[in-house]
Amino acid sequence: MTKRIVVDPITRIEGHLRIEVVVDENNVIQDAFSTATLWRGLETILKGRDPRDAGFFTQRICGVCTYSHYKAGISAVENALGIKPPLNAELIRSLMSISLILHDHTVHFYHLHGLDWCDITSALKADPVAASKLAFKYSPNPIATGADELTAVQKRVAEFAAKGNLGPFANAYWGHKTYRFSPEQNLIVLSHYLKALEVQRVAAQMMAIWGAKQPHPQSLTVGGVTSVMDALDPSRLGDWLTKYKYVADFVNRAYYADVVMAAEVFKSEPSVLGGCNVKNFYSYQEIPLNKTEWMYSTGIVMDGDITKVHEINEDLITEEATHAWYKENKALHPYDGQQDPNYTGFKDMETVGPDGTMVKTKVIDEKGKYTWIKAPRYGGKPLEVGPLATIVVGLAAKNPRIEKVATQFLKDTGLPLAALFTTLGRTAARMLECKLSADYGFEAFNSLIANLKVDQSTYTTYKIDKNKEYKGRYMGTVPRGVLSHWVRIKNGVIQNYQAVVPSTWNAGPRDANGTKGPYEASLVGMKLQDLSQPLEIIRVIHSFDPCIACAVHVMDTKGNELSQYRVDPITVGCNL
């Protein structure tokens, strides 16, 4: 007899996501469904607006990936108008991307995903002196792991526990059987969790140097950047470099070491050795380091075969809505995408409750529509995007920087290449992508310094002919994977706009053929230890770093409400 488990909401992510799974009598997941429960609708808001404003609207898609959508909106319009920004502008944008990656991935591992690996209550039982000595096993120069520091961290969290309230650590499945770290290892990660709060603040300041503020920077404009004086001010350049070195140091001495430690301990934990059932990977070049070299490579790897990189045919990219809450079901290219809503709601069913008993709740209509996310496909096939795709495509393309960091990690952990195609591997790949920026971000900085000596231009002039029609797109790899924005311009205003975001590729539903997207496929076949504590589900989904940004209602250009959708509170099976 099968049972259904609903995890709603999936917390420690950006946005609103629920996961439903069907398990058999052995607690093995037989089917899975990914549902985004609120609507964004930003594409509709952009229609009829000046294309030069696109980036300022698109960065409001979410409060985490602000710069990614900002740059995408600006760059899509530049592509449509045939504008090439000066090299200085491109390099400043690279420094902003590097700042974002260092911030985003550090926050994800420690503050969003880390508690799926680290048992906080176990850390309270650790011997700080033993933990301090153990840290040297994973780093020749560990950070925030002195015996006195670890004792202070332990005492700080113990004070929360003594009051019967673990504060930010209160809502989790502590003591779960799939936690594998020793108390001392948990204490090391806990110390780095707290240290990362300081590090992410510095990384945000790096972005603000070039973008005026973070989140929602303001310095990009169609044609270039406006942070001209910052690029010419030695003190601002030095400030960015100092902060960059500080954050990069943490990545190499803490983040890298902690993932190496996780690889050693969790390589025998079955629940993290699967989680990658769509082995098609899509990456696109991003972060120019100079006139000719990019940090990331472009291409598609199919069926996990890293001996071949397929060139991208953009005409094969489509989105369909057979199982999404939109009226138009057929597969459309993003230039022609539609987003007229068609919300059909949930149905009643019994599911496994928090105490393991069956409870009545609302579940999706799995044969109908069940999410606000469309199903992107490439030639009819699902693709995974994100750091794992960056590393896999980079290895297949023989990208020297990616080869170096990935090869060193596999050597340090003793893991085979096949281990990358797992939940553990996906988590490691995000760290490796962060390490790429930590190890090679200075190349873009040095290129900017060198180019400013001979050329100080930061902007390319242009005109928009209102009698012409334009179309263009941005495509590039951002922290959560390949992001693309597609724009049509007519009569000097935006006629149509589509954003195909990384979590669209990964979190999308099955298509008309019943083929699952990466989230859904990643859960099938995994065994749960305890149906009332589905930590394994949380860990797999968090490894993708979900970003389900959305809006509840949409306004037309005159401020009139077009539609409003209320998502009723759902009695859920499990919360985390």
UniProtKB/Swiss-Prot annotation:
Gene3D superfamilies: Cytochrome-c3 Hydrogenase, chain B. It is an enzyme of class 1 (oxidoreductase). Its cofactor is Ni(2+). The keyword Membrane applies. Binds 1 nickel ion per subunit. Its main location: membrane. SUPFAM superfamilies: HydB/Nqo4-like. Ni(2+) binds at residues 62, 65, 547, 550. Signal peptide: none annotated. It comes from the Bacteria. It catalyses: H2 + a menaquinone = a menaquinol. Keywords: Cell membrane, Membrane, Metal-binding, Nickel, Oxidoreductase. GO terms for molecular function: ferredoxin hydrogenase activity; hydrogen:quinone oxidoreductase activity; nickel cation binding. Its EC number is 1.12.5.1. Belongs to the [NiFe]/[NiFeSe] hydrogenase large subunit family. This enzyme recycles the H(2) produced by nitrogenase to increase the production of ATP and to protect nitrogenase against inhibition or damage by O(2) under carbon- or phosphate-limited conditions. Heterodimer of a large and a small subunit. This is Quinone-reactive Ni/Fe-hydrogenase large chain. It comes from Wolinella succinogenes (strain ATCC 29543 / DSM 1740 / CCUG 13145 / JCM 31913 / LMG 7466 / NCTC 11488 / FDC 602W) (Vibrio succinogenes).
